[in-house]
């Protein structure tokens, strides 16, 4: 269903990004429930879709690649403190 006549481009970008993030959340949940081997391909698919939406946010000038690049080490440092993911 095309929403172009109902939503602005900005609204479409926000809405589709929210939907894609939700689909990634759901895929991660299924890995936790059903096992890594069974569902990890879905995580890759949905993560790629989220990355595509982030790229569009950069193209629209909402965020910059520099902002993203600066944020990554901050998050990784937090993970070192609050989780075992990077230990």
Regions found by a protein language model. Give the residues of each.
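Flexible "arm" and connector segments at domain edges
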Residues: 1-87
